[in-house]
Amino acid sequence: SERHARIGNLFAHFDLAQVSKAKASELDSEKRHLLAIAAALSFEPSAIVADEPSKGLDEIGAAHVAKALFSYNKQVIFATHDTDMIRRPEYAIDRVLVLDEHAVAFDGAPAEAVAFYEDLIRRKYEAAKR
């Protein structure tokens, strides 16, 4: 069927073919993240929404997941504390919202957003020390 072909293509794209018969619980964190992205894309969404896509991954795993997330020509909306991911030009992130206390505190370009976020964290840390 068309859906099986699409899933096969996604598994090939995300280098999951060799683990296609494994249970998700048997996969390492990186493969589970990639499987979640592939599963979402199997429904042909117009956008991908991800919460902390690199959480719990080492630097290499986080890079693989981020590359996968941004490699499928879909709009990506995600929440993260991973400022390295936001800074990477190859992901072509064009807009970043920084939230503070459940409200938008900054809306703009990645580099400025990272600087704002880092300053915000620094100010909160300094205030907590007092």
Predicted regions and their residues:
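Conserved D-loop/post-Walker B switch-helix segment of ABC ATPase nucleotide-binding domains
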Residues: 55-67
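Catalytic Walker B motif of ABC-type/P-loop ATPase nucleotide-binding domains
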Residues: 48-52
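Conserved ABC ATPase "signature" region
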Residues: 2-19
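Conserved ABC ATPase signature
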Residues: 23-27
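Conserved beta-strand-loop-alpha-helix hinge in the C-terminal portion
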Residues: 103-126
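Hydrophobic anchor residue at the start of the ABC signature
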Residues: 37
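H-loop/switch region of ABC-family ATPase nucleotide-binding domains
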Residues: 79-83
